Regions:
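His/Asp/Glu-rich metal-coordinating catalytic cores
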Residues: 2-67, 72-227
Length: 229
């Protein structure tokens, strides 16, 4: 008799920030991302918010690994506060792992994290799960989605992504790999849905780059640019 696959959202649904989710099958748990959320104007005295990991703390011995999709704060920012409590291995692409190492050091985390760098296309066996990282296009290099092979079927976690055929950095989202999975059959798709309620599509980053080039070229004085990571 087949077991039960549980999807446990710990943050990030219906909100921007605190992205964190767990998948459980039998005695095995994997965790995807661990982000923070910045407070709104009504949350006086709060510097940031992190997910409630009570579910995981009760089952910390069952956690086989934590998978990080990319290096934005809403996906890695809570790790300095949660990882010492969970003490589990962390898997991420190279740039994401480097950003996470800096984050952990700056926040004063004691001890050496069990941090593993994973290449896209590489598969990681974690208990009942086998996870493959695949490239997606996002506003930061080395962004990835996850193909999670479970005893009940394939779960695809998109990570944060956009469809951009002419990205300025990194490669486009690997639609051919997703097409292959579609042909095999996918049990569940967990997809980024930011601004999905709006009609139309998001233009390429190249269009934005061309506009910025024109603005900067026409500026008569010093140009200051504010960016985020």
């Amino acid at each position: 008799m087949a077991g039960k696959l549980s999807i446990i959202p710990l943050g990030g649904l219906g909100e921007i920030g605190k992205n964190m989710m767990a998948l459980a099958y039998g005695d095995d748990i994997i965790v995807i991302d661990a982000g923070l959320m910045f407070p709104d104007a009504e949350m006086l005295g709060a510097d940031f918010l992190i997910p409630d990991i009570g579910y995981l703390l009760k089952r910390r011995r069952n956690i086989r690994g934590m998978l990080i999709t990319h290096g934005h704060e809403d996906h890695i920012g809570a790790l300095p506060y949660l990882l010492p409590q969970l003490d589990c291995p962390v898997y991420a692409a190279r740039l994401t792992a480097k950003l996470l190492s800096v984050e952990l050091r700056q926040r004063g985390m004691k001890g050496k994290p069990k941090l593993h760098i994973v290449s896209t296309g590489e598969k990681v066996a974690l208990g009942s799960f086998t996870v493959e990282f695949f490239p997606v296009c996002h506003s930061i290099p080395d962004a990835t989605g996850l193909i999670i092979d479970t005893p009940l079927g394939i779960v695809v976690h998109s990570g944060d992504f956009k469809i951009d055929y002419t990205p300025i950095i990194d490669a486009p989202t690997d639609l051919s790999r997703l097409s292959q999975l579609g042909g095999k059959g996918v049990l569940l798709l967990l997809s980024d849905s930011t601004y999905v309620e709006l009609s139309g599509y998001t233009p390429s980053e190249k269009v934005v780059g061309d506009v910025l080039d024109n603005i900067i070229a026409g500026a008569s004085g010093r140009v200051l640019s504010l960016i985020h990571i």
